[in-house]
Amino acid sequence: EAEMQWLTALAGVALLRTIKATPAVRLDSELSLKWPNDLLLGGRKLAGILCEHVDLAASGHLVIVGVGLNIGALPEAVKDFAATIECSLDSSSREDFIDAFRGNLVDCISAGDLAAWRESYASLVAVFGRECPVHLPGKAVLSATPLSIDDHAHLVCQSREGEIFTVTTGELSPTPLVEGHLS
């Protein structure tokens, strides 16, 4: 069960490592992770990750890991909050990239325990210690400072009043909001 809670975070770590290790990818800014499921390039969204669990009853279960990665030109309307990578990946190189991502994900999951997962993920999150809007379910927004990740891959924050609380579902906006879009 712990693997399921951490899968999205570990997929982010694996994707970041894969991009950095791919010679055909040219980066012009720093890569970082944004809790719970985004990869940022220079503070703008480069990729999103979604994991879906499928229960197969008696035969077990499987998880589908979906990754949306911006490659090539972006529409003008999204350039303030989205990023893209320049790369030259032909179809066989794309297959190699996907294989490398899968291998990195298996390595991340196999690498150990909760402490190792938390350390790997937290070392790549750029917003710790920086106040930003936290969007909660039901359209509630509060200003808080992300502090850490707990054992369940949830975000631990501190309110302006000093209260420590855990966010299990929500979205951070570490960069300025563009009308109608979370960063």
Regions found by a protein language model. Name each.
Residues 1-2:
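Short, polar/flexible loop-turn hinges at active-site or ligand-entry regions and domain interfaces
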